[in-house]
Amino acid sequence: MSFAEYLRQNGSDVLEALKIHVQLSSLSILIAVLIAIPTGIILTRHDRAAKAVLAVAGIIQTIPGLVMLGMGLMLFGLGSKPAVIVLVAYAILPIIQNTYTGIKEIDILYIEAARGIGMSQSQILFKVEIPLGLPAIVAGIRLSVVYIISWATLAALIGAGGLGDLIWTGLSSYDTNMILAGAIPASILSIIAGLVIDLIHRAVTPKPMRIKGDA
C-alpha cells in the first residue's frame, strides 16, 4: 500500500492524533510559560536563588526523556497527566533562562532613567524591563515549543496519545506508512510553530533608529 493510499484510508485517525498532539503540546507550553516567566522575573531580583534554580532546571534537562516519562508513569500513572508534567518540566528551563538573561542584560541606563522620572518598581518592570526583554523571552518560548512538539511523540509510550502513537505502533509492526503518518505531521507542525514564533520575535524586536541622511 502506498503512503497516499494509507492516508486516504486512515486520514481521520491521523487528524485525530494530530489534534491530540497539538492539545498536549499547547497545554504544556502554556503551563510552562505561566510558571517560567514570573519565575525568571523573580530570579532577576535574587541572584543567589537564580543560580540554584537554574542549576536544578539544568539538571532536569539532562535527564533522558524516557527516564522522565518512566518516573512520571510511576508517580502519576498512565495518560496525559504525567506526560504534561514531564513536558512542562522540560519546557521551563529555556523560558526561565531567557527571561532572566533578557531582563538582566538590559542597560542600567534605561532603569536609571525610568527611576529618574519617578516610575515605581512595578512600572519599571512592566513598562521598561519586560518590553525590552521580550525578544529574549520569545526566543526562549520558541526553543521550548520546538522541543516540546518533538518530545511529545514520546508521550504516547505512557498512554497520552498523539502522533507518537502512530510512530511507535508503526515501529513495533514495521509499518512504514504508519511511521510516516506520525513523523511527517510532527515535523511540519514543529516547522510551522517555529516560523510563527519567528514572526512574533521579529515583531517584538526593537528596530534600529534611522537617522535622516544615512545611506
What are the roles of these predicted feature ranges?
Residues 17-24, 73-94, 134, 178, ...:
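Loop-to-helix entry region at the N-terminal start of transmembrane alpha-helices
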Residues 73-74, 151-180, 184-185, 211-214:
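Glycine-rich helix-loop "coupling/hinge" segments at transmembrane-helix boundaries
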Residues 26, 30-38, 42, 88, ...:
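Generic alpha-helical transmembrane segments of integral inner-membrane proteins
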Residues 1-28:
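Periplasmic/extracellular loop-to-transmembrane helix junction in inner-membrane transport proteins
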Residues 47, 104, 180-215:
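C-terminal transmembrane helix and the adjacent membrane-cytosol boundary/short C-terminal tail
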Residues 26, 89, 122-154, 186, ...:
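Transmembrane alpha-helices
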Residues 99-137:
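Short cytoplasmic-facing helical segments at TM-TM junctions of multi-pass membrane proteins
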